[in-house]
Amino acid sequence: MARITSMILVAGLTLAACNQASEQRNADALNAAKNVAENAGDRIENAAENAIEALKPTPDAQDFVNLAARSDAFEIAAAKLASANATSAEVKAFALQMIKAHSESTAKIKLAAGKARPAVIPNPDLTLGQKKDLDELRQKKGAAFDEEYIDGQVDAHEDALALMRSYASGGTDAALKAAAGEIAPVVEGHLKMARALESKTDK
């Protein structure tokens, strides 16, 4: 009887081990499938962004510097709110980086605008939509603030990247085209960071 019980126990343990190994294989396969899907999704998203950018008309020099200045001003204002009100250390660190980076791009655009022919003066006045977005952000607290800020950062950086790429490829002023070409990869890096944070802050 004891031998039979022992055999049953061994068989049970073996079956459990097999089930555990099978579950691990299934989990590994599921993770691999998720990674493939995510990579495919990224490629589709990038292709869609490129198609949209191709359809947008390239702004003239004055419109370009105005749009760039407003984008930077909005980013800095939102980042200052986030540096004071965000609950996530990662979000606060991102906000501080945005203040520095967009202050630098503001200076770069101003310098290029002065070299443009004819010279143009950037107008950083926020649009009504940007002001509304900042007002809504001020109303958020805690984790909801982090989510609102990062969601807005994804949208803002998508727009900024499209603007910089558009002028870098089709702009009419050489100095501004060069500045846009230098700023575009920086904005692209910010967008990737914002999307990574979005996956952590979205509820």
Locate the predicted segments by residue.
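Bacterial N-terminal signal peptides that target proteins for export
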Residues: M1-M7
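His/Met- and acidic-residue-enriched segments that coordinate or traffic transition-metal cofactors
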Residues: A2, N19-K203
